């Protein structure tokens, strides 16, 4: 569960506080260099923000769905009670406890 709570720290955006003038100078140099090259305009939409708000919920739903599928897979993989396959698979149980549900119909 710790990995789920850690995702918020990795996926959230960070706000940079006002730093030293040297960092500001570097940004200015990078911005000036970018003006010389062709820069494509990028449009940000509100859809990204909505997706970020539901990230944890979607992750929990995915985990729950995976758990349900794994339990359903185990349930369907079990042999029917009282069948020859069940008696063969659970032979030690059927010998020690002949009245066990898996050994009888």
Curated annotation (Swiss-Prot):
Domain of life where this protein originates: Eukaryota
Transit peptide endpoints, chain numbering: 1-77
Keyword tRNA processing part of the UniProt annotation: no
Intracellular or extracellular location(s): Plastid, Chloroplast thylakoid membrane
Modification after translation: The maturation of the PSII-T precursor to its final form occurs through a two step process. First, a stromal intermediate is formed, which, upon translocation into the thylakoid membrane, is processed to the mature protein.
Residues in the signal sequence: none
GO biological process: photosynthesis
Main location: plastid
A GO-annotated cellular component: photosystem II
Record's keyword terms, sorted: Chloroplast, Membrane, Photosynthesis, Photosystem II, Plastid, Thylakoid, Transit peptide
Role this protein plays: May be a component of the oxygen-evolving complex.
Protein name per its UniProtKB record: Photosystem II 5 kDa protein, chloroplastic
Gene encoding the protein: PSBT
């Amino acid at each position: 569960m710790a990995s789920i709570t850690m995702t918020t720290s990795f996926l959230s955006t960070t706000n940079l506080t006002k730093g030293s003038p040297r960092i500001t100078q570097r940004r200015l140099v990078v911005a000036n260099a970018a003006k010389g090259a062709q820069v494509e305009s990028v449009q940000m939409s509100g859809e990204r923000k909505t997706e970020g708000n539901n990230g944890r919920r979607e992750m929990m739903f995915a985990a729950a769905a995976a758990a349900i599928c794994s339990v359903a897979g185990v349930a369907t993989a079990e042999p029917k009670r009282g069948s020859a396959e069940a008696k063969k698979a659970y032979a030690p149980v059927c010998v020690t406890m002949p009245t066990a549900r898996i050994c009888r119909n």
